[in-house]
């Protein structure tokens, strides 16, 4: 029997989460604020998206943990990445977006960016004082 699973994350802000999802090539579904599951059941989410293989995924705010949780029906997960790897990629891009936004606010510029073989991203930043 299929049911919805919620997976805790450390993602605390909507804007960098949406930017991360978009940068990874995932389209946010602006009209739907729910995730469909087995036998047409659905659950409400704050951010909804469709992955390949008709996999439905959403992120829902959890007031207790002050973070978003991933919501999906794991029995219907047909995406090419395992759910753990998907969360890892989203978390990495979320951190990247957060760092870029904060450093630009503080007057830093990216001098160099390297995507390493191990999947990490190396940034070199500079700030010019007047």
Residue ranges of predicted features:
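Interaction-mediating elements
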Residues: 1-130
């Amino acid at each position: 029997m299929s049911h919805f699973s919620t997976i805790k994350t450390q993602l605390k802000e909507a804007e960098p989460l949406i930017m991360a999802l978009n940068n990874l090539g995932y389209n946010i579904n602006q009209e739907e604020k729910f995730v469909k599951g087995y036998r047409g059941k659905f659950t409400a989410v704050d951010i909804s998206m469709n992955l390949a293989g008709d996999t439905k995924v959403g992120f829902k705010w959890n007031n207790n943990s002050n973070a978003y949780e991933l919501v999906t029906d794991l029995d219907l997960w047909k995406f090419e990445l395992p759910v753990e790897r998907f969360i890892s990629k989203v978390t990495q891009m979320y951190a990247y977006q957060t760092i870029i936004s904060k450093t630009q606010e503080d007057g830093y510029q990216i001098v160099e960016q390297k995507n390493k073989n191990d999947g990490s991203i190396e940034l070199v930043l500079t700030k010019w004082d007047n």
